[in-house]
UniProtKB/Swiss-Prot annotation:
CDD domains: LppX-like. InterPro entries: LolA/LolB/LppX, LppX/LprAFG. It is found in: Cell membrane; Cell surface; Secreted, Cell wall; Secreted. Belongs to the LppX/LprAFG lipoprotein family. It comes from Mycobacterium leprae (strain TN). Residues 35-49 have a biased composition (Low complexity). This is Putative phthiocerol dimycocerosate transporter LppX. Forms a U-shaped beta-half-barrel with a large hydrophobic cavity which is large enough to hold a single phthiocerol dimycocerosate (PDIM) molecule. One of its GO terms (biological process) is lipid transport. GO terms for cellular component: cell surface; extracellular region; plasma membrane. Modified by Lgt on Cys-27 with an S-linked diacylglycerol with a mixture of C16 and C19 fatty acids (palmitic and tuberculostearic acid), signal peptide is removed by LspA, modified by Lnt with an amide-linked mixture of C16 and C19 fatty acids. A lipid is attached at residue 27 (S-diacylglycerol cysteine). Residues 1-26 form the signal peptide.
Amino acid sequence: MNDRKWVTSSVMLVTLSACLALGLSGCSSTKPDAQEQSSSSSPASSDPALTAEIKQSLETTKALSSVHVVVQTTGKVDALLGISNADVDVQANPLAVKGTCTYNDQPGVPFRVLGDNISVKLFDDWSNLGSISDLSTSHVLDPNTGITQVLSGVINLQAQGTEVVDRIPTNKITGTVPTSSVKMLDPKAKGSKLATVWIAQDGSHHLVRASIDLGSGSIQLTQSKWNEPVNTN
């Protein structure tokens, strides 16, 4: 893969991660199959209170107009193709993303999404790499999927106590994410994975952090500055 295609794919995946964190409905690359839908719709082993807490956090996240997102990885995450972390501001309706990432061990590489266009600044000028809809896989902009599939699909929920994340007291909850949801972040995923979410205790129901263990590595998304003004121009 040449450098241009490599950067394009990397930025695309980080953009999807940002979309997932914000809760935009049009950021999924796949739909669950019938078996997984049946399994995820009947989380018999989960505490109803935890299920309700996850659902409330989902609704709160979907209602955000903007958020700051930090994407971090550990280990080897092949799907990110050289991106190890990103620090971005995300605006919803319409989607706009602007920030920096560490690409191929080079920190501070700027990138942005404005409208449907992805641009990256490797040297002195912004270069348009194409559109999200052209570069992403089938159904990536399907309005019926997205963060709803990720969070509502989590089963086997277990409370793990409380934890302070970025000076915010949170409830820590673990669970299992079905394969179809994992594929949003790792298209090659072949099984369900463990996930952890941290939800603010202050009554806001904000999703402060979410982490998914992909086996060879993990992807962690941390949110802050909910609904605060962001500059994505």
